[in-house]
């Protein structure tokens, strides 16, 4: 059996640019990509916490240290500057691998200040 698992996640980053006329994609600060283990040109899902939109695109590297999150092309209709989003990538693996798998998660606050990284998502308390 093959399972689709969360590979990496940027939790609650803020959109800094939305460029309808750029070639598409989402430019992400290289430091953020590294923290979540997301590669340039990798498929990503973006979930807009601010307006509820959910869409897919691919990651491109933004300038390291710039804190850029630029939603480009047609996807710019789905996010505005200042929106809070979650960016995730996924990986396919065997059931055996999945049971040992730990995603890379980076948590953000304010103006894209990375507060911490983790290799697990905390259990949600009832």
From Swiss-Prot:
Heterooctamer of four alpha and four beta subunits. SUPFAM superfamilies: ADC-like (SSF50692). It comes from Enterobacter sp. (strain 638). It is found in: Cytoplasm. GO terms for cellular component: cytosol. Its EC number is 4.1.1.11. Is synthesized initially as an inactive proenzyme, which is activated by self-cleavage at a specific serine bond to produce a beta-subunit with a hydroxyl group at its C-terminus and an alpha-subunit with a pyruvoyl group at its N-terminus. Pfam families: Asp_decarbox. The active site is at residues 25, 58. Belongs to the PanD family. This is Aspartate 1-decarboxylase. It is an enzyme of class 4 (lyase). Pathway: Cofactor biosynthesis; (R)-pantothenate biosynthesis; beta-alanine from L-aspartate: step 1/1. InterPro entries: Asp_de-COase-like_dom_sf, Asp_decarbox. Catalyzes the pyruvoyl-dependent decarboxylation of aspartate to produce beta-alanine. Disulfide bonds: none annotated.
